[in-house]
């Protein structure tokens, strides 16, 4: 499971989740992605369960990128202990997720949109935040570039 190799401090405050994600909110590596709609904490176990679900579905077809990392320690007190006597020990690690954050990306030549959508749907069930499937349509980018070239040619023809 994911966790930092070393940290400056063992324990952290809980903090609050306000606003939307300003970093990590665009697709950087693959063609398809899972984007968070809510805010919440995603544990290292949930990230691993989602990764396994996607990997098992796509088999050896493509590649998966995990765009979040659990770097926040969550502490817990032992059961049936009295109040006081300090903060509990770190039990697990979480990634703080804000709306708009890309959680997972998927790509590869063998991956179709239907395959990616189904794999991401399986991963969605393992996560505590509401998510949506997004994709980059390569054909639209190519066609828009071709249209700009064609429009430049037509403008030159009109000038002559």
UniProtKB/Swiss-Prot annotation:
Enumerate the PROSITE patterns for this protein.
RIBOSOMAL_L16_1, RIBOSOMAL_L16_2
User: What cellular component GO annotations does this protein have?
Assistant: ribonucleoprotein complex; ribosome
Q: Name one GO biological process term.
A: translation
Key words, A-Z? Ribonucleoprotein, Ribosomal protein, RNA-binding, rRNA-binding, tRNA-binding
Q: Which domain of life is it from?
A: Bacteria
TM spans (from-to): none
Please give the CDD domains that the UniProt record associates with this protein. Ribosomal_L16_L10e
InterPro entries cross-referenced by the UniProt entry: Ribosomal_uL16, Ribosomal_uL16_bact-type, Ribosomal_uL16_CS, Ribosomal_uL16_dom, Ribosomal_uL16_sf
Q: List the disulfide bonds.
A: none
- MF term (GO), any: rRNA binding
Assembly and binders: Part of the 50S ribosomal subunit.
Summary of the function given for this chain in its UniProt record: Binds 23S rRNA and is also seen to make contacts with the A and possibly P site tRNAs.
Instruction: Describe the family membership recorded for this protein in Swiss-Prot or TrEMBL.
Output: Belongs to the universal ribosomal protein uL16 family.
Can you say what this protein is called?
A: Large ribosomal subunit protein uL16
What is this protein's gene name? rplP
């Amino acid at each position: 499971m994911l966790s930092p190799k070393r940290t400056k401090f063992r324990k952290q405050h809980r903090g609050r989740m306000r606003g939307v994600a300003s970093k990590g909110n665009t697709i950087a590596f693959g063609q398809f992605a899972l984007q968070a709609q809510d805010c919440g904490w995603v544990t290292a176990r949930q990230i691993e369960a989602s990764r396994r679900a996607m990997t098992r579905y796509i088999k050896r077809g493509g590649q998966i990128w995990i765009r979040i990392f659990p770097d926040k320690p969550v502490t817990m007190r032992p059961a049936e202990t009295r109040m006081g006597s300090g903060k509990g020990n770190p039990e697990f690690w979480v990634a703080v997720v804000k709306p708009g954050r890309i959680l997972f990306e998927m790509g590869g030549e063998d991956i179709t949109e239907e395959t990616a959508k189904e794999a991401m749907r399986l991963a969605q069930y393992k996560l505590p935040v509401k998510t949506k499937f997004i994709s980059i349509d390569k054909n639209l980018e190519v066609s828009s570039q071709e249209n700009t070239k064609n429009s430049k040619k037509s403008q030159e023809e009109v000038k002559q």
